[in-house]
Amino acid sequence: MDYTKITRYTTGIDSILYKLIENCIDLRPTTYRLKILLHKAIELRNIEAVRLLLNNDVDPVAIDTHGITSLHTLTMPPNSSFIELDNWCSNTYTELLEVINRLNKSKTSYSFQRVELMRMIMDYCKDDEISKCLTISRMEPSRQIEEIQIMDILLSKGIDINFKDDIGNTALHYACDYRNGLNMVRHLIKNGADINIENDYGTTPLACAVSTRNIELVSILLDSGADPNSSSSSSIGTKVLHTAVGSGNFNIAKELIESGADPNIGDKAGVTPLHVAAIDEDSYALLELLLDNGADPNIKCSNGTTPLFQAMHNYNRVKLLFMYGADINIIDNQGNTPFTNLMSYDNEKLNSIIILQIMLIRKLFNDKMYYPAGLIKNLECIESHENLMNMAKRCEKLIKNKKSKDIVPDRISSELLDEEYDLDGWRSTSCSIS
C-alpha cells in the first residue's frame, strides 16, 4: 500500500464529507444518520460541515449508543495515523484492513466513532471512493483553532458542558486524556466545566491529566481549582498522588504536593504514596520527595505493613527510611517485622545497616524486660543465623568502643567490617545513646 498516496487522498476528506452532508440533507435522512454525520464532521474538525448540519436543525445534544454527545467527540483526539504499509494493493478489502489495523492501535474511547464512519461511508460512496474517505487524516496546527470555533458553536446551541457519557466521562475528561488538549481544556474551564467531577469509576479530569504525564495540563487544572487530593479510582480508593508516584513521575508528584496533596493519604487498603514509592527500585527520588514533605515512614496499611516492609530488598531505600525514623521493630498483622519478613539474609551489605540499627536500639534499654516485642523478634532472628550473629558482634564492638557523639553516619563505615561495606551518608534517629 502506498502510504504517501493514501495520505494525499486525505486532503480531500473535508470536501468529500461536506458533499456527503449536502446530498444527505437533500434526501431527508433519519435523525440517526444526521447524528452520525455531525459526530464525523466534528471528529474531523470540519467546521463548515458542522455549521451546515446545525443550520439544518441537527440536534447538537443528541447522544449516540455510547452516551456520547458531539461535545465529547470534539474533545477526543483528532484522527491520526499510526501505521505505514509499504505494499500498495488497489482493492477495497486491503483499504479496510488498513483502517482496522489503525483502529486497533487507536484509543478505545473513540475507536467506535471510526467504525460508524466506515459503515456510513460504505452506504453513501462507491467502492473506489472508500479509500479516500476512510484514510485517517493528520492533525494540522489550524485544527486547534477549529476546535475552539466548533466548541463555541456547540455551546451557543445550549449543549451541557458537563454532560456525562455512559461511563460518566465529561468532555473535560476526554480533553485531559489528550496530551495536545491544552487549548481545549482551557476553553472548557473558561466556559464552566466542572474540574472535580468524577466519572463512574471515580476518575477525575485531574487523574486523566496525571495519566498523560503532561505537567502543563496538570498545572492548568490545579491553578483553576482542581483538588490535589482528588480520586483516581473509587474501586480501590487511590488518589492522583498515588497515580503520579506509581507512574514514577517526579515533577507531577512535586506539583501535586506543592498544591496541597496529602503524602499520607491512603487508599481503601491504607496504602499511601510512600508505600507505592518504596516498592519501585527506580523511585528513590520520589521516596525522598515524600519523606521531605511529611510522609510518615511508620504509617501502616490494612495488613499492618509500613513502607519499610516494601523497601527491605534495597539498601539505599532502607538507609533513607532509617534517616527519617523508620522503625525496624514494627510488627505486621502476620507477626513479622520488616527484618523477619525477609526471604533470605544473604545480602551482607543490607544486613549490616539493619543489624547496626537493631543493636543501637537495643542499647537504649537497660533491662530486657522492657524490650519491645518487635525488637525481641529481630534479636531471635539474628541469633538463629550464624552470619547475622557475626555481624551483630561486630556492631556491638563498634558501639561499645564509641561514645554517643561518635556514632554518626560518616564515621562508622571505615570501621565496620574492615571497610568492606560502604555506609557513607547513613544516620539514624535512634543513635542518641545515653
From Swiss-Prot:
Key word Ribonucleoprotein present: no
Source organism superkingdom: Viruses
Positions of ANK repeats: 33-62, 134-163, 167-197, 201-230, 236-265, 269-299, 303-330
Keywords: ANK repeat, Repeat
A matching Pfam family: Ank_2
PANTHER family: MOLTING PROTEIN MLT-4 (PTHR24178)
Protein name: Putative ankyrin repeat protein FPV023
Source organism: Fowlpox virus (strain NVSL) (FPV)
